[in-house]
Amino acid sequence: MQQKKHNSIIGWGISLLTMLIFMASCHEGIFYHSYQPVNPTGWEQNDTLVYICPQAWYAPSCQLEIGIRHKDSYKYRDIWLIINTDTVHLYLSDSIGNWKGNGIGDTRQWSAPIHLNSFDQDSIKELRIMHIMQDTPLKGIEHVGIRIKETP
């Protein structure tokens, strides 16, 4: 009798844990989220990161976020990118040098919503990202990601 009660509690606990994990993994409205690694020796200006979405999305009804994972040793407070034909300027730290975003160890991750002017009327399936910083290779950037979600 005691064993059955113990097994029932364990079964209930496993079910609850599974449900919580499932709920945490569901992000409503997100239909594309991907990070790509940058060459560990540095990001060359001609190294283009290409993101091919599984389905085309219409920019006015979606929100695009760009995410950057970088080392604390990244020597700039900002980064300039070209996304398809738009130039994007992102600040990775505030005016006194405090990194934005969160991190573990010496790696930080920060993301921000962006608006791409060239996409106002188009259906988009592919995004191409490259940096336009003067340093080449650009050191300290580990991953660049995008997240696309429907706006409510």
Locate predicted features.
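An anionic, turn-rich surface loop/hairpin at beta-sheet edges
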Residues: 89-120
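Noncatalytic modules at the cell exterior or secretory-pathway interfaces
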Residues: 58-66, 117-135
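Bacterial signal peptide processing site
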Residues: 27-29
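Post-signal peptide N-terminal segment of mature Sec-exported envelope proteins
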Residues: 34-54
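C-terminal motif of bacterial Sec signal peptides marking the signal peptidase cleavage site
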Residues: 22-25
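Short amphipathic, basic-aromatic surface patches that mediate peripheral association
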Residues: 66-74
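Short coil-to-beta strand junction motifs in C2/discoidin
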Residues: 74-82, 141-142
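Exposed low-complexity, polar/acidic, P/S/T/G-rich flexible segments that act as propeptides
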Residues: 85, 134-152
